[in-house]
């Protein structure tokens, strides 16, 4: 994430927090990102320097007025005018980080060899919340490289309980033994 994205995303969060709109703006940013991912040609069009800025902002206005809060629309127009609309995902990420910090939320990703059952996911979620004392936003991923067990990534901190990690530790221990 660039410094520009941090600055813009943080500024939007500050504005939303002043008005008590943090959750609404977060949801709308997510929706706009999804729309732009589904329509990459539209993003290219909005980022084309040969089209006057006023026209590009007008396109945003036509597409989103009444669909998103005015703060989100104006934010997108500012990014469009500055030629930094491609920074939207970084701005949204910076916004989410500030939102999570303010609301006591930790993002966690559980990576396993097979999909977790709903019961396992619920149990893991509850355990992480009790250990951290924070609300957990848990995402799960499947990675065939994981032989067994689970690897957790909690905001950059990795907890590796996979069979691979245990085998590697055993290998290191055996190699360290001198006969």
Predicted regions and their residues:
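Elongated, mostly alpha-helical coiled-coil "stalk/stator" tethers of large membrane protein machines
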Residues: 1-179
């Amino acid at each position: 994430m660039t410094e520009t994205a941090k600055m813009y995303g943080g500024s939007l969060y500050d504005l939303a927090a002043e008005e008590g709109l943090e959750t609404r703006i977060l949801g709308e940013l997510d929706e706009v990102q999804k729309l732009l991912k589904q329509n990459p040609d539209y993003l290219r069009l909005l980022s084309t320097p040969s089209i006057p800025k006023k026209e590009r902002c007008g396109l945003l206005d036509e597409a989103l007025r009444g669909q998103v809060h005015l703060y989100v629309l104006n934010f997108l127009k500012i990014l469009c005018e500055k030629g930094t609309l491609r920074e939207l995902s970084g701005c949204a990420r910076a916004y989410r980080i500030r939102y999570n910090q303010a609301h006591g939320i930790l993002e966690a990703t559980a990576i396993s060899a097979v999909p977790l059952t709903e019961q396992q996911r619920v149990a893991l979620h509850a355990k992480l919340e009790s250990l951290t004392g924070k609300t957990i936003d848990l995402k799960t991923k499947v990675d065939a490289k994981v032989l067994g067990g689970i690897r957790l990534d909690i905001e950059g901190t990795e907890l590796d309980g996979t069979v691979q990690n245990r085998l590697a530790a055993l290998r290191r221990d055996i190699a360290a033994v001198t006969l």
